[in-house]
């Protein structure tokens, strides 16, 4: 069912230091992030995989997660909902991102946080947009800290170079 890893998010305590390390020492290319209200930086790992850095003061990593693009977002959404695996606590409800990709967070049996995403143009069951677990717009943390490289046209998917 999983088609590929889309991105990995790491929680950091100093965005600037971490971003400098991944760009200068690891050779990753910075790419625009969505316009979140908290410090974040996105990097291209491959044409289809990104590293996301988010600055938080978490004592346990309940926001750090693995993101996978799935073949059929709607089918998996309903299956995970039935199993009670959808977790809206760390990053909010199921959403359509500005680029059109869908986003949901689930917990695996061990409690690891996994983000499910679709391609921006994938067909999505319209009933999901009326579900109590769906919410319009980007997640808002209330921090109003907009540090990091961000753009209105950010996407999880980049064309091959």
Could you describe each region identified by the protein language model?
Residues 2, 9-50:
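Core segments of cupin and vicinal oxygen chelate
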Residues 5-7, 61-66:
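Eukaryotic phosphotyrosine signaling hubs
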Residues 15, 66-113, 121-124, 139-161:
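Vicinal oxygen chelate
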Residues 35-40, 60-62, 97-102:
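Short acidic/glycine-enriched loop/turn segments that link adjacent beta-strands
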Residues 47-50, 59-61, 71-76:
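Short, charged/polar surface micro-motifs in flexible loops or helix N-caps
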Residues 52-54, 105, 115:
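Conserved beta-strand in the GNAT
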Residues 128-137:
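Short, compositionally biased
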């Amino acid at each position: 069912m999983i088609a590929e890893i889309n991105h990995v998010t790491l929680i950091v305590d100093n965005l600037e230091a971490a971003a400098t390390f991944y760009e200068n020492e690891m050779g990753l290319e910075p790419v625009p992030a969505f316009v979140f209200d908290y410090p974040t930086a996105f990097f291209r790992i491959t044409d289809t995989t990104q590293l996301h850095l988010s600055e938080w003061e978490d004592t346990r990593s309940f926001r750090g997660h693995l993101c996978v693009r799935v073949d059929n977002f709607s089918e998996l959404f309903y299956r995970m909902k039935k199993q009670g695996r959808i977790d809206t606590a760390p990053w909010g409800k199921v959403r359509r991102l500005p680029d059109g990709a869908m986003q949901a967070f689930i917990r695996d049996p061990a409690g690891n946080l996994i983000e499910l995403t679709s391609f921006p143009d994938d067909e999505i069951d319209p009933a999901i947009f009326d579900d109590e677990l769906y919410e319009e717009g980007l997640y808002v943390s209330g921090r109003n800290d907009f540090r990091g490289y961000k753009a209105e046209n950010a996407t999880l998917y980049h064309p091959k170079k």
